[in-house]
UniProtKB/Swiss-Prot annotation:
This is Deoxyguanosinetriphosphate triphosphohydrolase-like protein. It comes from the Bacteria. The keyword Hydrolase applies. Residues 22-32 have a biased composition (Basic and acidic residues). One of its GO terms (molecular function) is dGTPase activity. Residues 1-32 are annotated as: Disordered. HAMAP family: dGTPase_type2. One of its GO terms (biological process) is dGTP catabolic process. Gene3D superfamilies: Hypothetical protein af1432. CDD domains: HDc. Signal peptide: none annotated. NCBIfam families: dGTP_triPase, PRK01286.1-1, PRK01286.1-3.
Length: 404
């Protein structure tokens, strides 16, 4: 076996040697598996570097120690690899999916996504998973023979389906997409390169998705404590974190609040990882899938929180929503961020010359706002960092919110 070609440990794991391939054929690497190459391509992409200056919750200039999309992504990848290793899955595919999962987020996090979605209403809307797919299949320009990163089918599938199927067998949208339909970027690509939107994704993709949940919960608690939006003792309102805080107090009665918070975050991550592994092992023992295709056809997720952990995790999300995401300070800044995104879209719509040359309408292309030009503007704004969006707004407008 070649260097770097570690085989998956379990029959239900994805195997790079049996990948369904890439949209554009390439010779295999002598030193890296197909999934390792995907992982490396994501890391070296321009979109990945931009995550450094994209918001997780707090805008980039609010503090050097708050999480950005990049630090969050690295933390998701660490948790995902730990889960994959424990379950005998392909760690490289798992890591590639964890590293790619947030590439499509616009500046200012979910506030930016809401604003762009409103701006693109009538032109297909904006969905960050669809934008991730656009980035890795079209918008990255690093290779002479193709646009995008030419990732394997398995990585593209996981990018799109990590939260479950998007459609039924008749191609009718289901779940979160039932009302508005499958995002146009996903639907268009799926016609070229069938991602089987009706099936579940691989276990590696399911692991990356649940690692995202674990990282969000634990690290947003950490950032919320650091920002002073709530205190460690406020977390006693939930049974799981209350028990952990009590255990920390028993073992370290004189610990200061900073270290108590850090111990709580570590303990929460460890607890949720252990719970997921236990539940996954139980489900896999019951289902006994003999291949990754049997995983896809199983009809339900095999990676999940057990009921008690799912209830605890839902309570944590509800706490964070009330005490952090809807905190007046955060809401004020995010409202101003939405204004910046809407203003930029309107200016580029009304004055195409305000766009950089490479984003201008091509010769012969209509300068009226149609779906193609609206998407071009949306792609440009979605690729901005928080810092660039603020700087660009200052260039184009007399007054720009301070976002503080």
């Amino acid at each position: 076996m070649a260097v770097g070609m570690a085989a998956p440990h379990a029959t239900y794991a994805s195997d790079p040697a049996r990948s369904r391939g890439r949209l554009f054929d390439e010779p295999p690497s002598k030193t890296r598996s197909a999934f390792r190459r995907d992982c490396d391509r994501v890391i070296h992409s321009t979109a990945f570097r931009r995550l450094k200056h994209k918001t997780q919750v707090f805008v980039y200039h609010e503090g050097d120690h708050y999480r950005t999309r990049l630090t969050h992504t690295l933390e998701v990848a660490q948790i995902a690899r730990a889960l994959a290793r424990q379950l005998g899955l392909d760690e490289d595919l798992t890591e590639a999916l964890a590293l790619a999962h947030d590439l499509g987020h616009p500046p200012f996090g979910h506030a930016g996504e809401r604003a762009l979605d409103a701006c693109l209403d009538g032109y297909g809307g904006f969905d960050h998973n669809a934008q991730t797919l656009r980035i890795v299949t079209l918008l990255e320009h690093r290779y002479p023979d193709f646009d995008g990163l030419n990732l394997t089918w398995e990585t593209l599938e996981g990018v799109v389906k990590h939260n479950g199927p998007l459609a039924d067998r008749a191609c009718n949208a289901i779940g979160r997409y039932q009302r508005r339909g499958i995002p146009v970027g996903i639907a268009d690509f799926n016609r070229r390169h069938d991602l089987e939107l009706w099936s579940f994704a691989s276990l590696e993709a399911q692991v990356a998705a649940i690692a995202d949940d674990i990282a969000y919960d634990a690290h947003d608690i950490d950032d919320g404590l650091r920002a002073g939006l709530f205190a460690v003792d406020d977390l006693k309102a939930m049974p799981l974190t209350a028990a952990m805080i009590a255990d920390i107090a028993r073992r370290h009665p004189l610990l200061d609040d900073h270290r108590r918070g850090a111990a709580l975050v570590r303990g929460l991550i460890s607890h949720l990882i252990t719970a997921v592994v236990s539940e996954a092992e139980r489900r896999l023992a019951d289902a006994r899938p003999q291949s990754v295709d049997e995983v896809r056809r199983h009809g339900q997720a095999l990676i999940a929180f057990p009921p008690a952990a799912a209830e605890a995790e839902a309570l944590i999300k509800a706490f964070l929503k009330q005490r952090m995401y809807r905190h007046p300070r955060v809401m004020r800044v995010m409202g101003e961020a939405e204004t910046i995104v809407r203003d930029l879209f309107a200016r580029y719509r009304d004055d195409p010359a305000a766009l950089p040359a490479e984003w201008l309408p091509e010769d012969g292309e209509s300068r009226e706002l149609d779906a193609e030009r609206a998407r071009r503007i949306g792609n440009f704004i979605a690729g901005m960092t928080d810092r660039f969006a603020i700087t660009e707004h200052r260039r184009l407008f007399d007054s720009t919110p301070e976002l503080r």
